[in-house]
């Protein structure tokens, strides 16, 4: 029986034009024997646009719902997940060659981990790429390490939430993505790290597109009152999980 990685992509109108690139990066993934992917593309709205722009591929599942932001869209897509592993892929980003296979290998080699992340290259408007100099070493990341780094470095984690691959059972136990207008992916990463070990792959796993229309480039994303509120609730949730579950969560390894 084929095992699946369920790739979830939330879509808002300005990012539709980049879906072809995201799909192309999925098609080019060289999967391990016995594995395939499904792509759950979730519109943050109900315009029906996705059916007009996505190819006819049985691995694609299209959904929509009332507008609620990326966290709501991601969590609604979770209802259609059939894989034991859930991978994040934003509509304007692209996976690098072998990214999914490396996630799978990490889970197989380390059944104790609940999630994986990888290195990121920022994809600039002119086509150039820019890396980051604070990537951790290749290997496992202890419970709580992401939160500690995030707190000590101005609310910036040492691993990128846009590269997250997480066990479905753990994702469900944490309630999916946080009900926030933004930073919901960071909230999930810190919550997962609070209750389980993770793994970091130093090979580049994602091209993270920088462009004027992306949500994180908007002025509202850094509006002080909302920003501080988001950071406080993300921090409080992770700390509460760590306190209430000092031994972490018992994980169900992917079959």
Specify the residue positions occupied by each region the protein language model found.
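Conserved donor NDP-sugar-binding/catalytic core segment of glycosyltransferases
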Residues: 100-132
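Short beta-strand/loop segment that forms part of the nucleotide-sugar
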Residues: 23, 34-46, 61-66, 91
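Short, well-formed alpha-helical segments that are part of the catalytic scaffolds
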Residues: 14-29
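Catalytic core of nucleotide-sugar-dependent glycosyltransferases
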Residues: 143-146, 204, 208-211, 217-248
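A recurrent flexible, glycine/aromatic-enriched loop bordering the glycosyltransferase active site
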Residues: 144-165
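Glycine-rich, basic loop-to-helix element that forms the pyrophosphate-binding segment
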Residues: 64-81
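Short aromatic/hydrophobic "clamp" motif used to bind/position activated sugar donors
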Residues: 86
